[in-house]
Amino acid sequence: MTKTETKVEPKAEVKPKEDNVEVIEDDEFEEFEDNMAEGEDNSKEQWEDDWDTDKIDDDFSKQLRAEIESHSTMKS
């Protein structure tokens, strides 16, 4: 080794402290029976077919239309 070369010593690796913690795995899945029994009528709808077509003649709709019309006549 020459005078200009310096010896580089590798640093000791720092190992993270490992705690002796017991890992409790709660990954067990509970199995449930199927809700659909054989031969059962499955025609029951989850949602109403007309869920987005509410009554357009209810009180709220009438008040809303009147308010919109009054604001549109004010701007004109």
UniProtKB/Swiss-Prot annotation:
Residues 30-62 are annotated as: Disordered. SMART domains: DSS1_SEM1 (SM01385). One of its GO terms (cellular component) is proteasome regulatory particle, lid subcomplex. GO terms for biological process: double-strand break repair via homologous recombination; mRNA export from nucleus; proteasome assembly. It comes from the Eukaryota. Keywords: Proteasome. Residues 30-40, 47-57 have a biased composition (Acidic residues). InterPro entries: DSS1_SEM1. Pfam families: DSS1_SEM1. Part of the 26S proteasome. Subunit of the 26S proteasome which plays a role in ubiquitin-dependent proteolysis. Belongs to the DSS1/SEM1 family. This is Probable 26S proteasome complex subunit sem1. It comes from Dictyostelium discoideum.
